[in-house]
Amino acid sequence: MMAYMNPGPHYSVNALALSGPNVDLMHQAVPYSSAPRKQRRERTTFTRSQLEELEALFAKTQYPDVYAREEVALKINLPESRVQVWFKNRRAKCRQQRQQQKQQQQPPGAQTKARPAKRKAGTSPRPSTDVCTDPLGISDSYSPSLPGPSGSPTTAVATVSIWSPASEAPLPEAQRAGLVASGPSLTSAPYAMTYAPASAFCSSPSAYASPSSYFSGLDPYLSPMVPQLGGPALSPLSGPSVGPSLAQSPTSLSGQSYSTYSPVDSLEFKDPTGTWKFTYNPMDPLDYKDQSAWKFQIL
């Protein structure tokens, strides 16, 4: 108990006890003193007789075991650790002397050339043709083969590009005449595939005389398979195997079961003046026409 009461170095507890020589160390402006350095070991000075004994053992072996070091330490009256350090320093000095002797024996020009030659001997030169192989086996010169044109030029374009209604314009007159020339018919096609100008769809009611001309203006939008077919096989109204129903004239078709179509026919009112006049009465959907019969139930 009295050991804690002995006066010693005054320490501060929560900065309350500020007496003693170390009070200045608590102030922030005063730098703390570094830890005391470890006292260096005194440099050992060997006598001539000690050096002779150590050199004699070093001539026998540069790495003596602990027993040989202890025996020499007893002879020269030194600790065994000092003998061990002396042998360590002596081996380093011996290596340095040998390097200096090698440098003196070689000319200055050979010394500068010896280092690159030594570096090249350690590493094998990499051939210029060494190319890292691809683990997937695909070389740099690989390029996927594009599908070639199997039929007409329009077929190749259709396989590469995406179909768009705006990209399909009506063909010129000369090319259209070549398409109608000959070829198998397409009677099994869902729509008639003739290239008629778009004005035939909106110009006059006579353009709706037959089903083939009725769908002619919608071909660029209803038949995306048109550019994928051969050139001379696009007209169903010509060729040797055309059916009699499709080979007839528009007038004969209209005489059978297809009458001339008019935009007014689709409307309920035949009177042109009253076509776009719709009389709507908001009271019609109501069940009770009389307003007095209206009853609202509060939910």
Swiss-Prot record:
Retina. Residues 39-98 bind DNA. GO terms for cellular component: chromatin; nucleus; RNA polymerase II transcription regulator complex; transcription regulator complex. Residues 94-155, 236-258 are annotated as: Disordered. Keywords: Activator, Developmental protein, Differentiation, DNA-binding, Homeobox, Neurogenesis, Nucleus, Sensory transduction, Transcription, Transcription regulation, Vision. Pfam families: Homeodomain, TF_Otx. Coiled coil: none annotated. Transcription factor that binds and transactivates the sequence 5'-TAATC[CA]-3' which is found upstream of several photoreceptor-specific genes, including the opsin genes. Acts synergistically with other transcription factors, such as NRL, RORB and RAX, to regulate photoreceptor cell-specific gene transcription. Essential for the maintenance of mammalian photoreceptors. This is Cone-rod homeobox protein.
